[in-house]
Amino acid sequence: MEIFQGNNQLKEGGFVATIGMFDGVHLGHQFLIEDLRKVASSEGLRSAVITFGDHPQRVLRPGGDLRMIMTLEERLRIIGELGVDTVIVMDFTPELAALESREFMKLLMQDYGVRTLVMGFNHRFGCNKDEYFEDYVTHGEELGLKVVRAREYQGEYSPV
């Protein structure tokens, strides 16, 4: 598994990617990564998990008492064991936090070579987080980025 760290542009592209913290790499995360790998395989592209070295809440709400379940190294190890080709560890900065979802999607395409974005069934991103899956699909169509919704993982009592 290749690991890229920092907010640097990648010269090589062609990824099917998903994005999230993946703290704990729980069954829902594992299910999402399974979908990611299937989509990447069907499209003949490499799979990529985009995550953050530190939790975005530390930038959004500095001074809060936020505890992580796993270290970055533990998350990377488990994600690698799940068969992901590449992990991109972004730095979550105030500038990144200020991006609207469409601009963030454009950045993923231009700077990281993402061609398809696999979204968790209830995942939202962008500075306002006021958009829904259909909005991301519309942005993707405008930008030339395919957006796919992963299947919902049903835990014993509720979706995960």
Please tell me what each predicted stretch does.
Residues 1-160:
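Nucleotidyltransferase catalytic core that binds NTPs
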